[in-house]
Amino acid sequence: MPAIDLSTIDLRAIKPSDLDWRKFTLDTGHPMRRIFIWSVAVNMGIGQSGERLEKAAKVMSELTGRTPSYRLAHKSIKDFGIRRGEPIGLLVTLRRNEAVWFLLRALAAVDFTLREESFNAGNVSFGIREHILVPGSRYDPALGIFGFDVAVTLARPGFRVQYRRRARADVGKDHRVSREETIRFFQDVLGVRILKR
């Protein structure tokens, strides 16, 4: 049973404050074993700086409600006209209510259908070809159409130990989220259909 009945809500009008990210968890019987959405990263690779990148930044901030950070080129590629250190992409990381809010809208853009190959241990990635497919977004001829990638990371309570500054430690193998659990989370909690290979 999905955590939210999508037939009763309008994804074009929903706001992050209307959602509670704690409801979007997969209960596995023990409070420390429950699985939840850790983060949703939205990435746009533009491949060039300048006006097109600024337009993409405007589109991304409208989509996510956050100011994107600029991603820089790691090396110079003369054929593409890219210099090292030049901004060529955008990234926004969303957490908690904003993450669930954006993920529901992004999944609606792909009809709540994902390929089995998109899943690995605790992570899911998928792309959207045109940002206007996302409910609530609008087409602006002055900006154009951009595609983007969505990367979702799932976690369990206690995962913070691998990111904290003091007394950092690895998460045990048995406590990590497996690929099967990731697929089950998306099917049971978000109501996603999985396309087999």
From Swiss-Prot:
GO biological process: one example: translation
NCBIfam families documented for this protein: PRK04219.1
Source organism, top-level taxon: Archaea
Family: Belongs to the universal ribosomal protein uL5 family.
Subunit structure: Part of the 50S ribosomal subunit; contacts the 5S rRNA and probably tRNA. Forms a bridge to the 30S subunit in the 70S ribosome.
InterPro entries in alphabetical order: Ribosomal_uL5, Ribosomal_uL5_arc, Ribosomal_uL5_C, Ribosomal_uL5_dom_sf, Ribosomal_uL5_N
PANTHER family assigned to the protein according to its UniProt record, in alphabetical order: 60S RIBOSOMAL PROTEIN L11-RELATED
Cross-referenced Gene3D superfamilies: 3.30.1440.10
Protein name listed in UniProt: Large ribosomal subunit protein uL5
Pfam families in UniProt: Ribosomal_L5, Ribosomal_L5_C
Species of provenance: Caldivirga maquilingensis (strain ATCC 700844 / DSM 13496 / JCM 10307 / IC-167)
